[in-house]
Amino acid sequence: MDNFLSLTLTGETPRVTQGKGADFRWRWLGHGLLELTPNAPVDRALILSAGIHGNETAPVEMLDKLLSALYIGSLSLTWRVLVVFGNPQALAAGKRYCNSDMNRMFGRRWQSFAESDETRRARELELSLETFFSYEQARIRWHLDLHTAIRGSHHLRFGILPQRDRPWDTDFLAWLGAAGLEALVFHQAPGGTFTHFSTEHFGALSCTLELGKALPFGQNDLAQFSVTSQALSALLSGLETSTSSSPPLRYRVVSQITRHSDNFALYMDAQTLNFTAFTKGTLLAEEGDKRVTVTHDVEYVLFPNPAVACGLRAGLMLERLP
């Protein structure tokens, strides 16, 4: 299966749907779905996903290179792995999404959207994770969902961790730092993301990794992703990764700015970087009689977007943790 990406983009079905690599077996499970199982027994299961947004191509190309290394035997495999290229049609079209943002649909939230290829795909991915995690009771379950961002950031690479009732595993957080993440953002409430779904329903240690700028296929400089790629290679092979000399800064979400009507105004422009700081009392947004202001001494914005559809998030406000 050395043409997984090309098959995903063309929508073709491979003539052979299962086979053997150097030290593992593989199964093609459907478009953008590939399962890898080591020959030796393992108690670790890993979801590696990319392309939930079709314009975020660098992580897809990075995973494709890792798959090539596994197939030729230059990289060993010590996890059961499900590789997911999330939104094949949007990837092929070079669009963020074709109808609606799939990363708002998980946890059966797709039922609230008009039926489309993306709602059907979200349901398919939910079932795929259920099947993957029910196959064996893995002692360790991870999910790394790889993305790139539309706008610039004061932290070039950062991670977003879903709401979780239990404390986060220190080894998992340390690996995220070793993968080059400069900041970690901790959600305090449930959401419709792929990573929240895997955490809530399967107890996975999950993180959305934002790794740089969104560019079309063929325009990515993968050298910029080398730290993350090397950390993934070491993870797959069961090797230790060197810990970061400066651990990621930590933030928590303190509020969400939501657009409810056409009267909504967000007082940030296209040049506002992720993690831009605002001081207490600053007016962030208005909608009719409602004013959104900074309530903590300092808050930092993440994903500001004044052009979102009504009912969707126009930004998150963060507080830095000690």
Curated annotation (Swiss-Prot):
Q: Which residues cross the membrane?
A: none
Cofactor field: Zn(2+)
Q: Active site annotated at which positions?
A: E210
Q: Which PANTHER family match?
A: ASPARTOACYLASE (PTHR15162), SUCCINYLGLUTAMATE DESUCCINYLASE (PTHR15162:SF7)
GO BP, sorted A to Z: arginine catabolic process to glutamate; arginine catabolic process to succinate
What SUPFAM superfamilies does its record include? Zn-dependent exopeptidases (SSF53187)
Q: In which pathway does it act?
A: Amino-acid degradation; L-arginine degradation via AST pathway; L-glutamate and succinate from L-arginine: step 5/5
The UniProt keyword set, sorted, is: Arginine metabolism, Hydrolase, Metal-binding, Zinc
How many cofactors are bound and how? Binds 1 zinc ion per subunit.
EC no. given is: 3.5.1.96
Superkingdom is Bacteria
According to the record, the signal peptide region is none
Gene3D superfamilies xref list: Zn peptidases
Organism, by scientific name, is: Salmonella arizonae (strain ATCC BAA-731 / CDC346-86 / RSK2980)
- Database matches in NCBIfam families: arg_catab_astE, PRK05324.1
- GO molecular function: any one? hydrolase activity, acting on ester bonds
Amino acids binding Zn(2+): H53, E56, H147
What the record says about family reads:
Belongs to the AspA/AstE family. Succinylglutamate desuccinylase subfamily.
Q: Write down the chemical reaction(s) this protein catalyses.
A: N-succinyl-L-glutamate + H2O = L-glutamate + succinate
UniProt keyword Metal-binding present: yes
What this protein is called in its record is: Succinylglutamate desuccinylase
Chain's role: Transforms N(2)-succinylglutamate into succinate and glutamate.
